[in-house]
Each structure stands twice: as structure tokens, then as C-alpha cells.
Amino acid sequence: IPAAPVAAQARKLLRDLAFRPPLLAARSQVVQLTPRRWLNLQEYQSKKLMSDNGVKVQRFFVADTANEALEAAKRLNAKEIVLKAQILAGGRGKGVFSSGLKGGVHLTKDPEVVGQLAKQMIGYNLATKQTPKEGVKVNKVMVAEALDISRETYLAILMDRSCNGPVLVGSPQGGVDIEEVAASNPELIFKEQIDIIEGIKDSQAQRMAENLGFLGPLQNQAADQIKKLYNLFLKIDATQVEVNPFGETPEGQVVCFDAKINFDDNAEFRQKDIFAMDDKSENEPIENEAAKYDLKYIGLDGNIACFVNGAGLAMATCDIIFLNGGKPANFLDLGGGVKESQVYQAFKLLTADPKVEAILVNIFGGIVNCAIIANGITKACRELELKVPLVVRLEGTNVHEAQNILTNSGLPITSAVDLEDAAKKAVASVTKK
């Protein structure tokens, strides 16, 4: 199996596609909290989902005070305890708290130490390589039984469009970055395509368990866990269930030690209980505000605001701004069923950002009615007293009516004939300042 495709399937296939290479430089300086473009759950929530569906995980409790953490550690009555700060960002183990405590993951055999550490975690910000400099506030900790791992493997279930369905991806080398394994030892990556109608076959689960290196009774146990993980994957409308490590203990137990679950946002209507667990406290406030009006907002570090319909067009708009020497301040996707009120709210969000020095509207009207966009723009400009340059490029449904609305508005709106023209004018409007 070629290394690159496997690596992509293992970790990147279902990542948000909002950023192409030209945007990576800006992406590293995104002005937001923990980057999220899909529903993610905290570690303890994912483990509870797995446990409730028969998947073997370590025993744990969740605490939101130091006293609760201490009592949880006592109730576990374990030989060793692991205390984990619960935030959505990675790199917790090497993070630093605003309290001065180093590390968001700690091992101890003493319940009293758990209480002492929790005092320095809960209510304080934890900064990691994936958080803003100031870090993210920790509201909860997970107090879990620390199990010895005699062997670590990797297992993931992905919804792979190229295979028209779910795919099992596994490797006997777990506990490490799967991309590294795929690049250095591609022969250690194994893949099983699953017919979504027939479901996972016993033979597929057994073969994957064997490829992961489980032997004897452990092989049957691993195969059973794989099938339960697949059933969970379908039941909760996941797009990815990644277990790393998927390991075995010296006592002969197959355990899912850590898991990441991504969900299909389109399934929210039938997964209400799961989506109700979404922790929005780590989002940028403006992103939460945008979601109230069905707007998809991603903050970037530039000064040209982008107001676009459709993720693909938004990517192209950000790219062409870069190519013309500018930097996008955001990625704002209006979507399909547009109302004037949405346009107004979008402008309200954009103009509230002090970084924004110009706004570029780029709309291709298929389902979207350009006239509605134009009316929303003129209303927003008047009521919000727009003070930054506005460049508008419209194409598609009712575009001539829309252009007349803008032209006759008497507002200082710069029209553009195409995307290239729009980007050049937006960049030029900022450069003049």
C-alpha cells in the first residue's frame, strides 16, 4: 500500500478541507481558540460512548473540582492513577498551566496527589502547541485507572469516499504518529474495505486482528472489539473513529486506551444527544455567534474579510487574495438558503473584527439569489455605517437585478467583473491606506 495515500486515509482524509497550501502560513497564525471545524468530544465523552457500547476502556471518573478528583481517585482503588486535563487540543502532556504546573497528564499512586494536582489544573489555562499562547481554560479532569500496556497497535475506521464506504486501517505499530509509520514502514499499514450494506465480516475483523499481531485468545478478543467499534461507528454517524493505542495489557486484556471520534454534522438531526455534548467554550466567540445564523466562520490573521457562498469558492477566494499579495482575515461561508438577515449578520460579524480593513464579497448564485445578497449588503452598509472599503463580485441568479441594486444605492461599493479583479481591488484598497 503506498505510504502517502494510507497516511492521508489514516489521519487527514476526513479533516476539514478549508485550507489549501497557500493558506498554511496564515493557518499557523489563526486567531481563534482550539481549531475545530466539526463536532469533537472531550476524551471522557468519547470513552463513555465506547464503554456504553461494549468497547473495553479503562475505568475512569470525571471531576470538576479538586475534591471530586480526590474522591474519584479513592473510589478507583487502582494501583496507579492517571490524571488528565480535559481540553480538545492535543499536546496536553507537554503543556504548561497558568498556575505554573507543567504537564496536563500526570501519573501517581497516591490519591492525595491527585487532589493536589487537580487544584493546579481546574480553573487554570493550559497552553499546548495547539492552543493560543494564553492557553485554554480547564473545567474538568479525568481521573482514570492507569493500565500497563504490553503492546500498542493502531486502529481506525474511516468513511472513505474513494472506497465508497467505511474502511478499516490498522498497524501493529501503535502509540506513534500513523503518518510516520506509513512513510517509513508502509508494509505495516493494513486496510480492509467494508461493504456498508453487508457490514463488517467476521473474517475481516479476524484478519485485521491477526495483522495487528494479536495471538491466540487475544486475537478473538481484538476481533470482537473491532466489530464493536465498527457498530459504534455506524450507530453514531461517525466519519472517523481512531484508537491509538489499541493495546493489550499484561493481564491479557485488549483495551482502547485513547480515542478520537469525528462526526457527520449532517446527522445532527438524529444524533441530538451526542451533539448536545458539544463543548463550544473552546471556540472563538465570533464562531459561536456565526453559527446562530447558519454561517460558517473561521478566523484568520489577515486584514481582508471574505464573505463567500460555498467552501470551495471560499478556498479559492482566500487563495487568490494571497496570490495578489493580500491576507484574508477570515473564511466565512454563507451557504445555500440565504436570507437578507443572514447577510446583515455576516457584515455585523465582519465589521466587529478590528483587524478587518476591507471586505471582499464573492458570490456565485446558483441556489443563492444575488438580488437578496445585494439587498442585504445595502441594508448592512447603511445601518452599520460601513467604514472600510467594500468590493463586491456577483455572478449567477438575478445578477443584473443585483448589480442595479448596488449601482443605484449611492453607497461607496466597488464592483468587480470576476474573482481576479475582485482580489486585486480588495488588496489595492488596503495597500492605499
Curated annotation (Swiss-Prot):
Q: Return the EC number.
A: 6.2.1.4
Pathway membership: Carbohydrate metabolism; tricarboxylic acid cycle; succinate from succinyl-CoA (ligase route): step 1/1
Q: What's one GO BP annotation on this UniProt entry?
A: succinyl-CoA metabolic process
* Cofactor: how and how many bound: Binds 1 Mg(2+) ion per subunit.
As for subcellular location, the record says: Mitochondrion
Q: Name one GO cellular component term.
A: mitochondrion
Mark out the transit peptide. Answer: 1-38
PTM Phosphoserine: at which residues?
Answer: 162
Annotated positions of the N6-acetyllysine modification: 74, 133, 140, 201, 228, 272, 292, 348, 387, 424
Q: Which reaction does it catalyse?
A: GTP + succinate + CoA = succinyl-CoA + GDP + phosphate
Q: Which cysteines are joined by disulfide bonds?
A: none
Matching HAMAP family = Succ_CoA_beta, Succ_CoA_betaG_euk
- What is the recorded function of this protein according to its Swiss-Prot or TrEMBL entry? GTP-specific succinyl-CoA synthetase functions in the citric acid cycle (TCA), coupling the hydrolysis of succinyl-CoA to the synthesis of GTP and thus represents the only step of substrate-level phosphorylation in the TCA. The beta subunit provides nucleotide specificity of the enzyme and binds the substrate succinate, while the binding sites for coenzyme A and phosphate are found in the alpha subunit.
Family statement: Belongs to the succinate/malate CoA ligase beta subunit family. GTP-specific subunit beta subfamily.
Its recorded name reads Succinate--CoA ligase [GDP-forming] subunit beta, mitochondrial
| Name of encoding gene | SUCLG2
